[in-house]
């Protein structure tokens, strides 16, 4: 299995265990200080696959800048403010986790249409999976600088 396929599988597994409405892994574009979509699964037809998030902008960008988890258990604000949906999706819970290897590699976001969807135990499991994603993203970045493809 390639590193790319393994990373996609980690994102999908995390979405499954968290009962996500949407799960999305954004990777860092350090030159532009933005986050770009790497992989996602969403039940929404309004998910914006072209959205780019600037560091420090909205909850996702703030996680990239602060490198600290962001959790809202009763999220009722308009999700267009988080720049991942083209229109309001009436979300109830939102979790954004920094994906860090040695440096910030990306941000993992998970949302739900249910309130209080991310208890402490689940956050711990998701954080562990995010750590694996960080390693995978770092490997992809290293190998993209070389001509030889990564070995699994």
Describe the predicted segments one by one:
Residues 92-100:
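A short, aliphatic-rich beta-strand micro-motif
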